[in-house]
Amino acid sequence: MAKRDIDFLFEIGSLRNMPRAWQQILSGKVQNISEHIFRTTMIAWIIAVAEKADINKVIKISLIHDIAESRAGDIAFLHREYVTRHEKLAEKHIFKDTILEKEASVLLEEYDERQTLEARIVKDADNLEVDLELKELAKIGDSSAVGMQKEHRPEVREKKLYTKTGKRMWDSIQKTDPNAWHQSLTNRWVKNRKGAK
């Protein structure tokens, strides 16, 4: 263990207090950064298995892909014209003197360069996680989410997704009801509720 490991763990815990930047324009309850990272990591794991990538590396990159946001915040497309963030500096300071410092630096550089399958998978997962959240928000009537889904996200599928699996997932997300996973359950409670024994 390194001298700053516990401080690092407290800092990443603070990501649950960091809302996603688009809270400003979306009316539904948006995720915090921790929630975004968790589901992005699960998506990345699925893609990594399908694409036969290095799962260990994919999961590590995914866990830290937005780590700078604990210090640099999250910004949306609207803010990019007005705000300069120093993400590399934030990443360096976050991992400084931790046991993960060297490996995290290498993985974050790999992610930024997008040259490896693993880095591309994580970027696909990052984008697909946005599509899942927009679909959920649209389902509860957020008109801004509906607009973003129709006007902007098809371009992401065509121009920003790297993997075949990522593109197939995007297509499936568009066709899937966010509530379908629990509405078709066949467990004992659901059967009893429907009158089955």
Where do the language-model regions lie?
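Alpha-helical, largely C-terminal catalytic domains
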Residues: 1-197
